[in-house]
Design a protein with these regions (language model features):
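Substrate-binding cleft of secreted/luminal carbohydrate-active enzymes
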Residues: 1-75
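Active-site proximal loops enriched in glycine and acidic residues that flank catalytic Cys/His/Asp
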Residues: 5-7, 41-45, 100-102, 121, ...
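Flexible, glycine-rich phosphate/dinucleotide-binding loops
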Residues: 10, 49, 124-126, 167
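Pro/Thr/Ser/Gly-rich low-complexity, intrinsically disordered linker/stalk tracts
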Residues: 54-110, 163-177
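Solvent-exposed loop/turn segments flanking beta-strands in beta-repeat/beta-sandwich domains
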Residues: 103-129, 153
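Short beta-strand segments within Ig-like beta-sandwich modules, predominantly Fibronectin type-III
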Residues: 133-139
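Beta-strand-rich modules
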Residues: 144-168
Length: 177
């Protein structure tokens, strides 16, 4: 289930239990308290773009800090694509690029249409459920790496998404950047 949020009403009216703030914190807490709620849509979009009541600022800084994956439509298809292949770091005139090959697919529904790139510290445990590690969601089978001093070790992890947002198993590579 997805909830429709009226941006003007949310920022215009005070929280009944804390009149010094608007309703956004309580609405977000309530929405996140129920596992059956998959997210929300904001109405009307121009109010978000115009940043009415600093609504957009709050979404960016507090509630949606990190990229997110669209919920899986597993009631239509729950088969994830195969994992990416041949992942490697290549030096180009634009710097280091992480390249990979799209997985093979038997049907159109199994084709990879996007890739998720995660970055973890060298000794950090890989946790794909933590969106703070997502550095890119891309249609391209490559990612420009942020080269630093060449001494810091990272683990990059790439997964493939099909058109119904099923996520493949991960492939990882340790890199010095």
């Amino acid at each position: 289930m997805f909830i429709g949020q009226s941006v003007p009403k949310t920022v215009q009216f005070a929280d009944p239990q804390n009149p010094s703030i608007n309703q956004l914190p309580r609405k977000m807490a309530l929405q996140r308290a129920y596992q059956t709620i998959g997210g929300s849509c904001q109405w009307y979009a121009a109010a978000v773009v115009e940043n009415q009541g600093r609504y957009r600022d709050a979404l960016i800084s507090e509630y949606h800090k990190y990229p997110a994956l669209v919920p899986v439509f597993d009631f239509m298809d729950d088969k994830a694509p195969d994992k990416v292949r041949k992942m490697k770091k290549v030096w180009t005139e634009d710097g280091y690029i992480l390249f990979w090959t799209a997985p093979k697919a038997d049907t159109e529904m199994d084709k990879a249409v996007r890739y998720v790139v995660y970055r973890f510290g060298n000794k950090e445990k890989v946790n794909l459920d933590d969106p703070s590690h997502i550095v890119a969601i891309t249609r391209n089978p490559f990612y420009k790496l942020p080269y630093e001093t060449g001494k810091t070790k990272y683990r990059y992890v790439v997964t493939a998404l099909d058109r119904l947002h099923n996520e493949s198993k991960s492939v990882s590579k340790k890199l010095k950047l």
